[in-house]
A protein has these predicted regions:
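Conserved N-terminal/central alpha/beta ligand/cofactor-binding core
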Residues: 1-80, 127, 150-156
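Flavin (FAD/FMN)-binding glycine-rich loop and adjacent Rossmann-like elements that form
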Residues: 15, 30, 73, 85-92, ...
């Protein structure tokens, strides 16, 4: 719903690899399977698909899972808690269903919201905004914490609707374009080649704006309105050129809460390529902190591991986190927040939750080696195997 149907980062393994394989086989923008895509789409080209294609493939994958029940239009509005000493025990959630509250009991709950709201409602400690470098002895970052999160971007897709219309890439202000199956971004100096390729449909990072507090719906609405106002000139240029513009249903938010876990992943871990003893997912992507300059020689890093402790909130039982809300500094978060890595973390969290529930074992007592073996059997560690 934020229109980021574009893959970056890795490794692309497990269910994420399965998804993009189907996307490449049946849903390419050009209508033909990309022959260089390989198993992971790591062919040096940009690949993207229509957001609806993502939804279609995900629903098809869900249909194969007999033990998954999907419920739509039923937001979580509360968390069921038991208190024991200095710990909270999460025993399920409360949802709003057709205007009434309904409680759902669960041996384990996973917060995969992307904003950490469930963990927040459970009373978990969380981090928000920029830390100072000295807070975690990181070599990159800012000297004094300012509490700012990364800016938000309103994504969009432009599509030709008039015969022979040409994307006015040289007139659009602050907007390059992503053409599917191309090894570079489309910019003004590429216009002649762009006309020759004649794609006719492009993905754009529309307008980027700051939101003071991405936890607050009113401030998000104001940021979205600002982004729309800043888009107006380009929207008119697109329309005059014979292009329709499909705006994402809502503003794209990069960063909200980061739930503090038993271990806080830092830039040092990523730079060193640390693989902790309790690693449950691999990750590989550069530091990508929008709104902050990171020296080029430090920006690009190698593979690293996500430890189980980073998805285990402190002082809380019965709850795991998944995706971009896990326990990490803002700098580390800027790398792990992308789709393949979030998917890998999600698979690990789901597997750990199933082990805990089936064995009636606390999340802090599960056999980590057994968890790792199960994840390995699902191919989750295949991305870093030696060729």
């Amino acid at each position: 719903d934020m229109y980021v149907p574009f893959i970056c980062g890795g490794p692309r393994v497990g269910v994420f690899q399965e998804m993009i394989q189907v996307l490449n086989a049946k849903h390419t923008i050009g209508g033909r399977t990309c022959e260089t895509f390989g198993k992971t789409g790591s062919d040096g080209k940009n690949h993207w698909w229509m957001p609806g294609s993502y939804a279609e493939v995900i629903y098809q994958l869900l249909e194969k899972e007999e033990n998954i029940t999907l419920m739509c239009a039923a937001p979580v509005v509360g968390v069921k808690l038991k208190t024991s000493g200095n710990r909270n025990q999460v025993t399920g959630v409360r949802i709003m269903r057709n205007g009434d509250y309904q409680d759902i009991d669960a041996a384990v709950t996973i917060d995969a919201t992307g904003n950490g709201l469930i963990a927040d409602m459970a009373g978990c400690e969380y981090m928000f905004g920029s830390e100072a470098k000295s807070d975690y002895n990181e070599p990159v970052g800012i000297e004094v914490a300012d509490g700012k999160v990364q800016p938000c971007t309103w994504m969009l897709i432009s599509e030709r609707i008039k015969r022979n219309a040409i994307l006015p890439i040289d007139k659009l202000k602050g907007s390059s374009a992503v053409e599917d199956n191309l090894n570079r971004w489309v910019k003004a100096d590429d216009k002649e080649d762009m006309i020759r390729r004649d794609a006719g449909i492009y993905l754009h990072w529309g307008r980027t704006v700051y939101c003071k507090d991405t936890r607050e719906p009113l401030l998000l609405a104001q940021a979205q309105q600002e982004a729309l106002e800043r888009l107006q000139e380009n929207l008119e240029i697109w329309h005059e050129a014979g292009y329709a513009v499909h705006l994402a249903p809502k503003l794209g938010v990069r960063e909200v809460r980061r739930i503090k876990g038993e271990y806080v992943l830092t830039a040092n871990d990523l730079i060193a390529g640390t693989m902790h003893d309790d690693v449950i997912a691999h990750a590989h992507y550069s530091f990508d902190v929008w709104g902050m300059k990171i020296p080029e020689e430090m920006k690009h890093i190698g593979p690293y591991g996500i430890p189980y402790r980073s998805i285990l909130p402190t002082k809380t039982e019965g709850l795991l986190t998944a995706g971009r809300i896990i326990s990490a500094t803002r700098i580390a978060h800027s790398s792990l927040r992308v789709q393949p890595i979030c998917s890998n973390i999600g698979m690990a969290a789901g597997t750990a939750a199933a082990m805990s529930a089936l064995n009636q074992t606390g999340l802090r007592s599960i056999d980590i080696k057994q968890l790792q073996d199960r994840l390995a059997s699902m191919g989750l560690f295949d991305g870093l195997k030696k060729k």
